[in-house]
Curated annotation (Swiss-Prot):
The keyword Glycosyltransferase does not apply. Residues 162-176 have a biased composition (Low complexity). The gene is rplP. This is Large ribosomal subunit protein uL16. The lineage of its organism: Bacteria, Bacillati, Cyanobacteriota, Cyanophyceae, Synechococcales. Belongs to the universal ribosomal protein uL16 family.
Length: 182
């Protein structure tokens, strides 16, 4: 199951889930995705159960990407414990999900839309929130999160490059040493 290797603090406050997801709301790796329709906490066990259901259905074909990670610890007190004496110990980890967040992605040569839809439907049953199946349009490419645009867009064209070089030499010659008047 998924959990962080180490954290700065052992315990966190519960927090509030307001608004919609502004990050992680576009298909970045595969052709098909499962998108959250409402907010909620998804535990590492639920993520693992969904992943198993999808991989079991698609067998060896294609690839599955998990786009959420359980990084929030949830603490619990032992049963029949009196009030006070501090916060409980971390029991499990959850991923905080807002509406619009992509949860899982799927892609590959052998994966058709029907196979992906059925695999995502099986994964939906394991999750505590409403979700929606998404597919990229024919010929559309994923957005590739974390990749820089091609280098050519950073380089200036030949005309601007030579003009900038000339302007730089003119400016440096004009601002060269001027005699001081005493």
């Amino acid at each position: 199951m998924l959990s962080p290797k180490r954290t700065k603090f052992r315990k966190q406050q519960r927090g509030r889930m307001r608004g919609v997801a502004t990050r992680g709301n576009k298909i970045a790796f595969g052709q098909f995705a499962l998108q959250a329709q409402e907010c909620g906490w998804i535990t590492s066990r639920q993520i693992e159960a969904s992943r198993r259901a999808m991989t079991r259905y698609v067998k060896r074909g294609g690839q599955i990407w998990i786009r959420i990670f359980p990084d929030k610890p949830v603490t619990m007190r032992p049963a029949e414990t009196r009030m006070g004496s501090g916060k409980g110990n971390p029991e499990f980890w959850v991923a905080v999900v807002k509406p619009g967040r992509i949860l899982f992605e799927m892609g590959g040569e052998e994966i058709t839309e029907e196979i992906a839809k059925e695999a995502m439907r099986l994964a939906q049953y394991k999750l505590p929130i409403k979700t929606k199946f998404l597919a990229l349009a024919e010929g559309e490419k994923p957005t590739q999160v974390g990749k820089a645009p091609p280098k050519s867009s950073f380089l200036p064209s030949d005309e601007t490059e030579t003009a900038a070089a000339q302007a730089g030499t003119e400016a440096s010659s004009a601002s060269s040493v001027t005699p001081l008047e005493s």
